[in-house]
Amino acid sequence: MKSPYQGKPEEKWLAITKRLINKHPLKDEIVDVVLQSWEDIFNSRIGSYSIGKEIFPEPQMMGFFLHELVAQNLALKYPKVYKRGDAKKEKDIHNTEDPSLGIEIKTSSNKDKIFANRSYAQPSSDSEKKDKNGYYLAINFEKFSKKGRKPRIRLIRFGFLEHEDWIPQKSEKGQQAHLSDLAYKTKLITLYQAE
């Protein structure tokens, strides 16, 4: 897929991102689906125990639940168009009619940053793997605290990212990648921010 930013000056990237988001069919629903999915976690039970009352999962587990529920809730609402991506070529939220509208989901308990596997900073090298370029849903949430307050969704952003936007850890043993400051400024749009 050709980059929508290729050959365009950086000062135009934000406008390009806004255009890409405006043409996405889920742009008006993403916030509601994410917030409902977050509530679904706290309405869940594991055995006889409730999440947030007797069980307090670590951030990685909360991110996993959120990641899964957002995709499942969209698949439930639009069963002929969306499904949870389950093949190596499919995005986390797979659009069966137009795969270019699929969405990768990244969650983090960091205040405002998201992270990915180091491989996201490399171009897709073979046709057996999913394209790392495309729409991304970035969700930041609070961890459980000792104060007992229910954690909240901090930030929901939607945008269009490419492998060049990810910066791998410098250490060769490092397995993580983070986004460039330019990507945060021009390629992710804030849809929701907790007060």
Model-derived features: positions:
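Nucleic-acid endonuclease domains
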Residues: 1-91, 107-195
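Active-site beta-strand-loop-beta-strand hairpin of nuclease catalytic cores
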Residues: 72, 94-102
